[in-house]
Amino acid sequence: MKISAIHISFVLLLTLSIVSCGNEEDFIPDSSFIKIYNDEFFESSYIPMDIVQAGNTGYFILSAYDAWNTYILRVDEDGEYMWDYKLEDNYVNPIKGLYYKDSAFYFFCMDDLSLAATLMKVTDQSKTAQVERTYGNIIYPLHSSAVDDGFLLESYNRESYSTRLTKLNNDFGIVWEEEYEVEQDVEESIISHLTRIGNRLPFFSGQAGNKYFLNGYYNYSMSMLFVNASDGTQTGVINGFRDKSAISSAKYLDGNSYALSRFDFGENFIIPKIDLNTSGTGISSDLEGNEHPEMMPNAFVYSQIIDVNGREITMYATSTKGGQILLYAYDAINGTLVGTHHLGRLNPYEAIDFVATNDGGLAVLGNTFVNGRFSRITLIKLSEKELIEFAN
């Protein structure tokens, strides 16, 4: 009954969304849309985490609800509701890192009693989430990402006061684990981040040639670490200052070049191309970049390297002080700004992530507040034409 009630409210809101789209943005039918996914229980709060495209059959959205419970939403290629599912209350803390593999969706969450990282599997046939694997020695999962031959899982070990990186193979089996000392207990900050009662922190990880990088607590502060891909041994670090100054996003370009963003005591900087010494020690506040005062203080920033009409573009998505989603497009080769694009006008919007779509467009996942107070999932689709107009 609960799922049916949610289903009805989704359908009603999607109908309203279709009618109102033309008033908000000049979108091309069938290739562009704005969808806001509502819940008839107004007290419920939804905080989207990640999105993945399922071939040509639409999108799968992972979300938290009511602080840190786990929710999944399936929509078709036009953003229309297909089905949804709320996991049992003991599976909490869904983290960024959502994968479509062999017609199934995979993501990590956490057991609320043991705190153990748990791998979930979801299919369109089951329309539910099933436990695929439990990692009993990995607690407080924070972020996961895909690499060439598997996956990375970042977590926090409260017993050793350390950030842990676990390398998983393509079947999600453990290859190696390594820890990096924080030197103090940051469990309270971790819990505040996970339950969303305090500052949200920019955990991320990725691959750069024969090295991996991760952003997490190290040496008292949020820092970006560089490690060997073969065993996780640390080679370099860019130190932040506590949780007040740090790297907020990073994407590897080539050679020693990265596309970064950083925050420093409320100010935000975008660095579309910079060479880093991944075998040395640096400080995030020393990295020069363009300040962007329009962004929210200590803004969350999401970046990807995407192809736009045959041109490699570093795309950044973030949130503005005025309650809009802002996209920045930079040439990935020379780092020059190509264009910007604002999304959202009627309700306040926050950027969560985005994915380049199979039809050459862009699907932007966001958070919006209906009537200024009810936190809901939103999906904004840009057509290939709209993307090319500002990003190429």
Task: Indicate residue ranges for each PLM-predicted region.
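Repeated scaffold domains used in trafficking and secretory/extracellular systems
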Residues: S45-V52, Y91-Y100, G136-V147, D185-S205, ...
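Hydrophobic strand positions within the blades of repeat-based beta-sheet folds
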Residues: I51, F60-L62, I72, W83, ...
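Short glycine/acidic-enriched loop and turn motifs that connect beta-strands
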Residues: Y65-N69, D111-A116, Y156-S162, Y217-M222, ...
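Bacterial Sec-dependent N-terminal signal peptides
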Residues: M1-I3, V11-Y46
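Blade-level signature of beta-propeller repeat domains, shared across WD40, Kelch, NHL, RCC1
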Residues: E350-N392
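A short beta-strand motif characteristic of beta-propeller blades
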Residues: F33-F42, Y81-E88, K127-T134, I174-E179, ...
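Beta-strand-rich domains and repeat architectures in extracellular enzymes and scaffolds
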Residues: D39-T70
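Beta-propeller blade signature
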Residues: I72-E77, T118-Q125, T163-G173, M222-S230, ...
